[in-house]
From Swiss-Prot:
It holds the Pfam family PRA-CH. Pathway: Amino-acid biosynthesis; L-histidine biosynthesis; L-histidine from 5-phospho-alpha-D-ribose 1-diphosphate: step 3/9. InterPro entries: PRA-CH, PRib_AMP_CycHydrolase_dom, PRib_AMP_CycHydrolase_sf. This is Phosphoribosyl-AMP cyclohydrolase.
Amino acid sequence: MIEQNETARPGDGLDWSAVLDTLPFNSDGLLPAIAQQHDSNEVLMLAWMNRQALEETLQTGRVCYYSRSRGTLWRKGESSGQVQHLHELRLDCDGDTLLLRVDQQGPACHTGRRSCFYNVLQGNRVVVSEPPQVDPQTLYGP
């Protein structure tokens, strides 16, 4: 359905509930969700959302993901205090990836770094590009 927007003019749109019903969640009921800082365009992290996480995020304005490792909803910042507030939701041209433009409070990464993308390929080495902003033990406790 989202493909209908490929030839649409700016300002044209589709009904959200109809689009939501046609999103191509994978066999586990998930879509990839990229979090990006809304005012700097910094890419913060990649996580997954099921329909319930997506609906909760839109309802509350606080980003909620689905944790594949725990098999449950994961409300970003619930234990660390490093919450993400949704500024804008975008869908890619196929509707199979979400872009969450957020206001990130503190580090986004569980390592205490601002972004999960701190490993940079330089030649034949993967180099750490930034130090943690916060000690992970401070974020999550012992």
